[in-house]
UniProtKB/Swiss-Prot annotation:
Its EC number is 2.1.1.56. This is mRNA-capping enzyme small subunit. It comes from the Viruses. GO terms for cellular component: virion component. Heterodimer of a large and a small subunit. Keywords: Methyltransferase, mRNA capping, mRNA processing, S-adenosyl-L-methionine, Transferase, Virion. It catalyses: a 5'-end (5'-triphosphoguanosine)-ribonucleoside in mRNA + S-adenosyl-L-methionine = a 5'-end (N(7)-methyl 5'-triphosphoguanosine)-ribonucleoside in mRNA + S-adenosyl-L-homocysteine. It comes from Swinepox virus (strain Kasza) (SWPV). The keyword Transcription regulation does not apply. It is an enzyme of class 2 (transferase). GO terms for molecular function: mRNA 5'-cap (guanine-N7-)-methyltransferase activity.
Amino acid sequence: MDKITRNIREGIHILLPFYENLPDISLSLGKSPLPSLEYGTNYFLQLSRVNDLNRLPTDMLSLFTHDIMLPETDMEKVYDILNIKSVKSYGKSIKADAVVADLSARNRLFKKDRELIKSNNYLTDNNLYISDYKMLTFEVFRPLFDLSSEKYCIVKLPTLFGKCVIDTIRVYCSLFKSVRLFKCASDSWLKDSAIMVASDIYKKNIDIFMSHIRSVLKSQYWKDSNNVQFSILKESVDKEFINKFLEFSTSVYESLYYVHSLLYSSMISDNKSIENEYQKKLTKLLL
């Protein structure tokens, strides 16, 4: 419990290793690889609680999260930490300290309004912006199309789970000599989003990677039609890297599981009111 409180109050970060050898790139657009136990069990352990929340009516979810859904200011926090004064995104041809892509559903928890679903057996889709590996699209590599003299490449990841997110980060670890992941205290601790900060470009591998990507896309420039699910590697990345990534993501998911458990217990509490012991614990933890 002390560890979870510390994670939420102080945030979590990790520096990932640099790999001089670029993995074998095999880009395919249109479909994400399915989740695999090889890439960590934390998602599967957490999914049952996410599904419990997913089937509850969204008006009720809004009520019980209204006071604990603080504005997500983690990107601004990272800018402050790194002394970034200017950023560019979406192809803007300006000089900046960083090129940025935000793939997260900022300040949003669910995708559409819906009523109660009576049991998890009737769930057909994930209506929450939580633990949804399909949210990661090829836009995660868009900053590379816009990169020129910027010191940093920053991506807000919508999720930390799935083969594709680990494969993507592994590729970035060969394109830049420094890759860090942050789950800031000022991010939402209801969602499994995080920030990747890459710096110190390794030009040799960037050139090889972008040549392959542009060949597959049949274009030198970014197109919005590229913003779809994708697969970037055929083979699994090495176990050493998976374990290093899981050091970070497991700490995030352990904290989220506790938060989600408190929220779910509050929403189904006997007194049918937002004034209950679970909500008080949740409020104390997140505010």
